[in-house]
From Swiss-Prot:
Assembly behavior: Heterodimer of LeuC and LeuD.
E.C. no: 4.2.1.33
GO biological process, one term: L-leucine biosynthetic process
Keyword flag Metal-binding: yes
Family recorded in the similarity comment: Belongs to the aconitase/IPM isomerase family. LeuC type 1 subfamily.
Cited PROSITE patterns: ACONITASE_1
Gene name in the database record: leuC
One of the Pfam families matching this protein, by short name: Aconitase
Binding-site list for [4Fe-4S] cluster: C339, C399, C402
Reactions performed catalytically: (2R,3S)-3-isopropylmalate = (2S)-2-isopropylmalate
Name of the protein this chain belongs to: 3-isopropylmalate dehydratase large subunit
Length: 458
């Protein structure tokens, strides 16, 4: 019997039609939708007189456009229209969805796992690239376009060409103060933002096994910034423990686990490419430029331009120079949130550093839990008080300042330490300057007023 990767096992069992090397029709186990990429898809169904084929396998939430100060006071007309249209569509087509302001509302890539809908062995799609987050559970999960959203709504299938297989081994035990966010930023900095193009990435190694499910989701989330189609990990006891007891966990849980345990890569499975990264000596990462690959370990000097026009443009946009270091960046804003790092564990790590301290003069800091359940859990632990006492604003749970699509935008020309996943030009607002880092690094920077080595604090 031919040895297979977890990706091969899951892909092959979901093929409805087609041969490998050609477009294949895949069955989809979970389709998650939000207000930005679904309106045209629903209108397409309406125009064609079609219904949603599997409403029970579809799930929606509002996240991108929702304000975080007063979630019901939506001033932007386009945002309001998208939210109102989404609410109308899910009601008309009978799709289960979190109510605006409801107990389960949050970022789409967080509420699916938190509700127990994300499970090993599933194929999961959403009209959003960071759907790869769900791959941490041993699922095939990837983002799709709006026309594909319509196709999945109508047929519960999607045409795809099977990607190649890449294995990435994270080896070693990280130093205290180094987190999974640093793992993935280091990987992208070393190999580039296009190294994963055309691949389904499997993350493995003892450094992955040691991570919590929340930390694993951070890595799979940023598979897209690595250029990959998707990222996934083999399920284990941590995976099963996370899913167990959640609202949509399987009723016959032990039976489900016995099946999930078979959904792992065979030891002699063959990959098209294998990369390794030793994290034992890794330092905290900070990006300096305008893509996630422009990152360095703390203390390293920003690189020379060397006729690289992308670097030259990045330096101009960020108002930085070769030879400077992260500690030279004049920070004005701190954002702790996003589908990359707004889970309970992320905010707990940041709160440990913030507790008993105060945000530096001249800085604005906001903390935005990624979902209502996380916000409630944070407040039960008193984390909200820690942040507010330190001078942070404690906001309502949605996408927030990850992207300039809602009121939480970073002012022009202001440098922001951000726990999000993208630092493109204008990503957080017109002419905003984004520096990606871990929640712990962002918290330490908030206190010091500049980037510092969090290893000296934790």
């Amino acid at each position: 019997m031919t040895a297979k990767t977890i990706f091969d096992k899951l892909w092959d069992r979901h093929v409805v039609a087609g041969n490998e090397g050609e477009p294949q029709l895949l069955y989809i186990d979970l389709h998650v939708i939000h207000e930005v990429t679904s309106p045209q898809a629903f209108q397409g169904l309406r125009d064609a007189g079609r219904s949603v084929r599997r409403r029970d396998l579809t799930y929606g939430t509002l996240d991108h456009n929702v304000p975080t100060k007063d979630i019901f006071n939506i001033q932007d007309l386009i945002s309001k229209k998208q939210i109102d249209t989404f609410t109308k569509n899910v009601k008309e087509f009978g799709i289960p969805a979190e109510a605006h302001g409801g107990k389960g509302q949050g970022i789409v890539h967080m509420v699916a796992p938190e509700s127990g809908r994300t499970q090993p062995g599933k194929t999961i799609v959403c009209g959003d690239s960071h759907t790869a987050t769900n791959g941490a559970f041993g699922a095939i999960a990837f983002g799709i376009g709006t026309s594909e959203v319509e196709h999945v709504l109508a047929t519960q299938t999607i045409w795809q060409v099977k990607p190649k297989r890449m294995k990435i081994e994270f080896q070693g035990h990280p130093q205290k103060g180094v987190y999974s966010k640093d793992f993935i930023l280091a990987l992208i900095a070393k190999y580039g933002v296009d190294a994963g193009v055309g691949y389904a990435v499997e993350y493995t190694g003892n450094a992955i096994s040691d991570l919590s499910m929340e930390e694993r989701m951070t890595i799979c989330n940023m598979s897209i910034e690595f250029g990959a189609k998707m990222g996934q990990m083999n399920p284990d006891e941590k995976t099963y423990d996370y899913v167990k007891g959640r609202e949509y966990a399987p009723e016959n849980f032990d039976e489900a686990v016995s099946k999930w345990e078979k959904l792992v890569s065979d030891s002699d499975a063959v990959y098209d490419k294998v990369l390794t990264l030793d994290v034992s000596q890794l330092k905290p990462m900070v990006t300096w430029g305008t893509n996630p690959g422009m990152g360095l370990e703390f203390g390293e000097e920003f690189p020379k331009i060397n006729d690289d026009l992308n670097y030259e443009r990045a330096y101009q946009y960020m108002d930085l120079k070769p030879g400077q270091t992260a500690s030279d960046i004049d920070l004005g804003y701190i954002f702790i949130g996003s589908c990359t790092n707004a889970r309970l564990g992320d905010l707990e790590e940041a709160a440990k550093i913030i507790k008993g301290n105060h945000i530096a003069d001249g800085l604005t800091g906001i903390v935005v839990p990624g979902s209502r359940p996380v916000k409630i859990a944070d407040e039960e632990l008193g984390l909200d008080k820690i942040f507010k006492n330190a001078g942070f604003e404690w906001r309502e749970p949605v996408c927030s300042a990850c992207l300039g699509m809602n009121p939480d935008q970073i002012p022009a020309y202001v440098h922001c330490a951000s726990t999000s996943n993208r630092n493109f030009e204008g990503r957080q607002g017109h002419n905003a300057r984004t520096h990606l880092c871990s929640p712990a690094m962002a918290a330490a920077a908030a206190i010091a007023g500049k980037f510092v080595d969090v290893r000296e604090i934790v």
